[in-house]
């Protein structure tokens, strides 16, 4: 137990006690900007507020001055409650101040964690490599590891129903009681106010209106969840040498005393699953993958272990159907915009030895990735590039732009999709996406000039085709000199993983969320 507590104290030795005064300093945003923390919840245009995203940091910096007045926010909230039926202006002001407080707290609390991350990287002499941040960097790992695994659990990570659970986790990191009380007051008033307008306000809506604060609390929850999941696996070599009582404390060191009887039985039954030496864990956004070389029975043990773990540690129930167990040789799984699978190919070889000949059958495994064409067409349809059936249509909202801007926008989307889906082993779906975007571009130009799409294709066929393919071909040529072209019939099965994809295209990101 002392070893584990020391491990935790080492990570949490930088607890801050000065956060609350910083909330009322307008120049804290300058300090935040110096540490690369200037992203804001206002990065999307807020039509209700009437501000553009270019002035988001200035907006928050100026509005924080109004919080200097004593109990100004509390009086404003009480005044809103007393005049709730006056009109929509009350909701405007409450939403306005809630975003100020949410943004201010998120910026303040990110600073010590950012400094801790930078110092830890410097102490461990870990180089800052953008290649490791690429979403494509995970696929070579999958290609190398999944070939040796048998089963895979596709996990949809649950999140707490109430934000108070996330605040309780934050208490173990930050000792500033005033800041935590202010955050609890904000969340309490936020839910009370919205319950008067929209009954049963969900955490999903809170995540949309307070993105920065929500993602900070959510990432903290993911860190706690993964730490408690990975730590027993790392310590599995010591499990046979310690008593069951220490094992109970090692795994459930934060569990409440009333749950000890339940957890003791639970640990004794599930502890042996951590001894699997071929377990692999991968996470992205709200999904994770747990792969193992073991049996289906072992994966079911992992499934019920996770369900009970979320229930007894985080105090919320997770439905078992959120964890789907699949056999890699029979099923494919969806991850990061690709349908991935492990295919088994058989080959026959005839061997001749003197006068005798015999046949040998060999089985080889291959990691395969394909583009999910139907969900991607649905995403293009939602963006008004085509119909639900995949028929290209014009983009009316872009008809007011110049011709070169229209072509550049379509070309940029096409190149980004080609860039991201270059790892597909079958390119037919990628070519279909390019065809839809190319014809949608022609129809948009034709609608602007009140002409037909066929005439534009005849006049601009070569130029339009070059706009959609040239830049992508140059990038591939620089990275892979042996590849000459990337046209319709070139590099048909060549899979390329780029290590510069830090941000996913909006169409792909929409696909990740809706699938």
UniProtKB/Swiss-Prot annotation:
Family: Belongs to the intron maturase 2 family. MatK subfamily.
Domain of life: Eukaryota
Species per Swiss-Prot/TrEMBL record: Zingiber mioga (Myoga ginger)
UniProt record, GO biological process: mRNA processing; RNA splicing; tRNA processing
Keywords: Chloroplast, mRNA processing, Plastid, RNA-binding, tRNA processing
InterPro entries per UniProt: Domain_X, Maturase_MatK, Maturase_MatK_N
Protein name: Maturase K
GO cellular component terms, A-Z: chloroplast
Plastid found in the keyword field: yes
Record carries keyword tRNA processing: yes
Location of this chain's protein in the cell: Plastid, Chloroplast
Broad class of where this protein is predominantly found: plastid
UniProt GO molecular function: RNA binding
Described purpose of this protein according to its UniProt entry: Usually encoded in the trnK tRNA gene intron. Probably assists in splicing its own and other chloroplast group II introns.
């Amino acid at each position: 137990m002392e070893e584990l507590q020391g491990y935790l104290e080492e990570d949490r030795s930088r607890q801050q006690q000065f956060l609350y005064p910083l909330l009322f300093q307008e120049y804290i945003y300058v300090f935040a900007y110096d540490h690369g923390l200037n992203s804001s919840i206002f990065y999307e245009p807020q039509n209700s507020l009437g501000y553009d995203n270019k002035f988001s940091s200035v907006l928050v910096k100026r509005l924080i001055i109004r919080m200097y007045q004593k109990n100004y926010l509390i009086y404003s909230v009480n005044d809103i409650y007393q005049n709730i039926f006056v009109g929509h202006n009350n909701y405007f002001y409450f939403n306005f101040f809630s975003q100020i407080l949410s943004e201010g707290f998120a910026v303040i609390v990110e600073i010590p964690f950012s400094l801790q991350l930078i110092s830890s990287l410097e102490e461990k002499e870990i180089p800052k490599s953008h290649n490791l941040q690429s979403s494509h960097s995970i696929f070579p790992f999958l290609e190398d590891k999944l070939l040796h695994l048998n089963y895979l659990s596709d996990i949809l990570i649950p999140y707490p129903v109430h934000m108070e659970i996330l605040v309780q986790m934050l208490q173990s990191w930050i000792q500033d009681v005033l800041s935590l009380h202010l955050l609890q007051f904000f969340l309490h008033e936020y839910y009370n106010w919205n319950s008067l307008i929209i009954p049963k306000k969900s955490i999903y809506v809170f995540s949309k209106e307070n993105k920065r604060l929500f993602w900070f609390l959510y990432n903290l929850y993911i860190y706690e969840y993964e730490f408690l999941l990975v730590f027993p696996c790392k310590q599995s070599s010591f499990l046979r040498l310690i008593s069951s009582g220490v094992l109970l404390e090692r795994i459930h060191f934060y569990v409440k005393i009333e749950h000890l009887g339940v957890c003791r039985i639970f640990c004794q039954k599930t502890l042996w699953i951590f001894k699997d030496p071929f377990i692999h864990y991968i996470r992205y956004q709200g999904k994770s993958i747990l792969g193992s070389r073991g049996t289906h029975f072992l994966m079911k043990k992992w499934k019920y272990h996770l369900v009970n773990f979320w229930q007894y540690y985080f105090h919320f129930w997770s439905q078992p159907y959120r964890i789907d167990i699949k056999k890699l040789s029979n099923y494919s799984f969806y991850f990061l915009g690709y349908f991935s699978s492990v295919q088994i190919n058989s080959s026959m070889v005839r061997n001749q030895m003197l006068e005798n000949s015999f046949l040998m059958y060999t089985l080889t495994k291959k990691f395969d990735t394909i583009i999910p064409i139907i969900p991607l067409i649905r995403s293009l349809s939602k963006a008004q590039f085509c119909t639900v059936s995949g028929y290209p249509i014009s983009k009316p909202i872009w008809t007011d732009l110049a011709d070169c801007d229209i072509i550049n926008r379509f070309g940029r989307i096409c190149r980004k999709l080609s860039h991201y889906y270059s790892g597909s082993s079958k390119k037919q779906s990628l070519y279909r996406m390019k065809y839809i975007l190319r014809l949608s571009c022609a129809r948009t130009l034709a609608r602007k000039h009140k002409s037909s799409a066929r005439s534009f294709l005849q006049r601009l066929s070569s130029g339009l085709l070059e706009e959609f393919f040239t830049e992508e071909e140059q990038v591939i040529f620089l990275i892979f000199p042996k590849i000459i072209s990337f046209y319709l019939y070139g590099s048909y099965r060549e899979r390329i993983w780029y290590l510069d994809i830090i941000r996913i295209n909006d169409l792909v990101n929409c696909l990740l969320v809706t699938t």
